[in-house]
């Protein structure tokens, strides 16, 4: 078991690193990837003249990238949409799109402390890294064959790395519950990793069938399979390094140049 554990971590670090996107330049990379995937490849959103996809939720979000360490190319991204601190009753996007379908006997987001919840969205991977058969029309693909064995060479390092980074970034900002709209099979994929994703309502149509779901950051960390813990801890260190760097810039740059969410919890 130990060689497999070490191989999983070493393989990830040999090819990829997680980079919190707290600077203007890094957020620009996020918006560029999103335009490539959501506007050009999938046509989920209209193309923009500046080739940057962004919306009204980006200013209140925590953004993250994954980079190919061999080429320096950023190959994927995601974000965590937080409730605005100046408007705690603001509804997250899934609360609007699933207002009539959330099973509030399972969980009612309206009753939770708003600063402790957030929504994962805009997870995207550029096309050269999702070109296996049947995956080109998905922003961040995974398949059953990826999970035959966790140490299998097809292990989906990019989407798993982004999800692990999201959980750790959320934890560091006091977010306990993460909501998201997911493809129907994602819960079964992540169950193989020891990650419990709970469905909180029936599927809705949102660029294909999407199921409103949730996961607890503390439960994900506590229940993670042993073989994956070193990988998670490596990603956690990369997140922490990004936060430290952002905090350092905040003391030396003019106010407003660094994303406020990066240095406040």
Go through the PLM ranges and name each one.
Residues 71-77, 118:
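Glycine-rich phosphate/pyrophosphate-binding loop shared by adenosine-nucleotide-utilizing enzymes
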Residues 77-80, 87-88:
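Hydrophobic alpha-helical segments and helix pairs
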Residues 53-56, 203:
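Short Gly/Pro-enriched turn/cap motifs at secondary-structure boundaries
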Residues 85-214:
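Acyl-donor binding region in acyl/amide transferases
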Residues 194-252:
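Accessory, usually C-terminal, subdomains that scaffold auxiliary metal cofactors
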Residues 49, 92-97, 156-160, 173, ...:
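Structured alpha-helical
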Residues 4-52, 59, 63-70, 79-82:
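Short amphipathic alpha-helix that is part of the acyltransferase structural core
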């Amino acid at each position: 078991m130990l060689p497999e554990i070490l191989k999983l971590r070493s393989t990830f670090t040999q090819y990829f690193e997680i980079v919190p996107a707290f600077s203007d330049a890094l957020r620009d990379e996020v918006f560029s990837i999103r335009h490539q995937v959501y506007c050009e490849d999938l046509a989920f959103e209209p193309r923009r003249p500046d080739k940057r996809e962004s919306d009204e939720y980006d200013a209140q979000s925590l953004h993250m990238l994954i980079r190919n360490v061999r080429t320096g190319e950023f190959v994927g991204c995601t974000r965590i949409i937080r409730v605005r601190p100046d408007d705690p009753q603001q509804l997250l996007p899934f609360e609007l799109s699933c207002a009539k379908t959330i099973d509030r006997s399972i969980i009612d987001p309206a009753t939770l402390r708003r600063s402790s919840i957030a929504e994962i969205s805009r997870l995207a991977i550029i096309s050269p890294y999702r070109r296996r058969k049947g995956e080109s029309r998905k922003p961040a693909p995974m398949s059953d064959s990826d999970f035959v064995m966790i140490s299998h060479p097809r292990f989906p390092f990019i989407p798993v790395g982004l999800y692990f980074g999201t959980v750790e970034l959320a934890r560091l900002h006091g977010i306990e519950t993460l909501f998201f709209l997911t493809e129907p099979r994602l819960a079964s994929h992540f169950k193989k990793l020891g990650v419990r994703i709970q469905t909180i309502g029936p599927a809705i149509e949102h660029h294909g069938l999407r199921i409103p779901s949730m996961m607890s950051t503390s439960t994900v960390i506590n229940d993670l399979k042993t073989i994956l813990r070193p990988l998670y801890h490596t990603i956690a260190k990369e997140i922490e390094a990004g936060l430290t760097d952002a905090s350092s810039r905040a003391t030396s740059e003019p106010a407003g140049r660094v994303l406020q969410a990066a240095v406040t919890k």
